From Swiss-Prot:
Pfam families: Peptidase_M28. This is Leucine aminopeptidase 1. It comes from Uncinocarpus reesii (strain UAMH 1704). PANTHER family: AMINOPEPTIDASE YDR415C-RELATED (PTHR12147:SF56), METALLOPEPTIDASE M28 FAMILY MEMBER (PTHR12147). Residues 20-95 form a propeptide.
Length: 395
């Protein structure tokens, strides 16, 4: 696998370009050289570690980051440079989470309503778009279809009369993000997220990118949890203590662009986000099983909020039928990092230990046939449990 990946990398990224990406250096927010008129992007590879790269170098870095140097991810912070500012070091919001789960009785009938069939049907359609690349026409089409599915869940539950709504969050690149809001008795907000875009790193604007696992699986997992959560009268009618939002982000693959835009806006407007859970890749278990290990979900432990992560462990123990394994994914590895960047407590649960996760992502081979909907059901149970428990928690 690693040899094949290196050959593929060589096909899309010249050695000199790749070397430039890997040779990290700190830079100031100066404009990039313009003598050759090649568009440049400012990426952040770690705290205080940024550099200008071409788009080709961005994709080369993602290939290297996943296949060779695990955890080598980045934020694209070009917009900050264009606007002449940088994100300050936000003080992390301190939240005390419950020490136990309390709503097993209320959640038992709801959990039984979670449907593998719904997730499969939605994922079949979602992966039928040629690509969900954030700059593509089909990326807009897939987002439009997803928006309609979220609205259908609201309509079917009759929740709109109680103020439940879904809205576009527009971006300059075409594909929009999606935010569904279930109002509670306060503006304290619990966020569940997944990213809707996909990418084929070899030729992003041309080749197919079904993105079944990355992150079609997370997209339909939280969609199903959202649908079932609205079956709760108390949640639907706004009786929970806190507001709950479900987010489907655009342009995660390009440097967490969609989620950065949303949490930047939330920070500017003083939104009180008490917790954010990211679901990115929820369906692949073959790597774990081939290694002779027990099927489990992967709880990320680096660059996350420790208190929220501890509570998620309680949720998994209480609502899932499989255990968790602790694992790491590195800096800026998914959209939870954007929440954390702006001071909001965040966490991330993935399909397995990171080294056992799907190696077919970002290619034409990231297809449904590789996924387990039984495993995705476990992620849906966890998502539903977390959303319900924190909706009623005193945060």
């Amino acid at each position: 696998m690693k040899h094949l990946s290196l050959l593929a990398l060589a096909a899309v990224a010249p050695t000199t370009a790749l070397a430039g990406v890997i040779d990290h250096q700190q830079v100031t927010f100066e404009k990039p050289p313009t003598h050759n008129q090649i568009e440049k992007f400012l990426i952040q590879l770690g705290p205080g570690e940024s550099r200008w790269v071409t788009e080709e170098e961005k994709w080369a870095l993602k290939l290297v980051g996943f296949y060779v140097l695990e955890g080598m991810n980045f934020f694209d912070i070009t917009a900050e440079s264009d606007q002449g500012f940088s994100v300050k070091s936000f003080e992390q919001t301190k939240v005390t989470y419950p020490s136990e789960i309390k709503y097993q009785k209320e959640l038992a009938p709801l959990s039984k309503d979670l449907s593998k069939g719904n997730m499969r049907e939605n994922l079949v359609k979602f992966t039928s778009f040629h690509t969900r690349y954030y700059k593509s026409e089909t990326g807009v089409q897939s987002a439009t279809w997803l928006l309609e599915r979220v609205q259908q869940a609201i309509d079917d539950s009759g929740a709109s009369k109680h103020g439940v709504k879904v809205e576009k969050f527009n971006h300059p690149w075409g594909q929009f993000s999606i935010i569904a809001t279930i109002p509670g008795r306060s503006n304290k907000t619990v966020v569940v997220g997944a990213h809707q875009d996909s990418i084929n790193l070899f030729l992003p604007s041309i080749l197919a990118a079904p993105g079944a696992d990355d992150d079609g699986s997370g997209t339909v997992t939280i969609l199903e949890a959202f649908r079932v959560l609205l079956q709760s009268d108390a949640i639907r009618e706004g009786k929970a203590a806190n507001t709950v939002e479900f987010h489907w982000y655009s342009a995660e693959e390009a440097g967490l662009l969609g989620s950065q835009a949303i949490f930047s806006e939330y920070s500017k407007t003083g939104r009180d986000v008490k917790a954010m859970l990211q679901q990115d890749m929820t369906g692949y278990v073959e790597g774990t099983l081939r290694a002779g290990e027990v099927e489990s979900v992967g709880v990320i432990t680096d660059f996350v909020d420790p208190g929220l992560t501890e509570f998620i462990k309680l949720v998994i123990k209480g609502y899932c039928d499989i255990p968790f394994v602790l694992t790491k994914c590195g800096y800026a590895c998914s959209d939870h990092a954007s929440a954390s960047r702006y001071g909001y407590p965040s966490a991330f649960v993935i399909e397995s230990e990171f080294k056992r996760s799907n190696q077919k992502i970002h290619t034409t081979s990231d297809t449904i046939e590789l996924l387990s909907f039984d495993h995705m059901l476990q992620h849906a149970k966890m998502t539903l449990g977390l959303a319900y428990e924190l909706a009623f928690a005193e945060l």
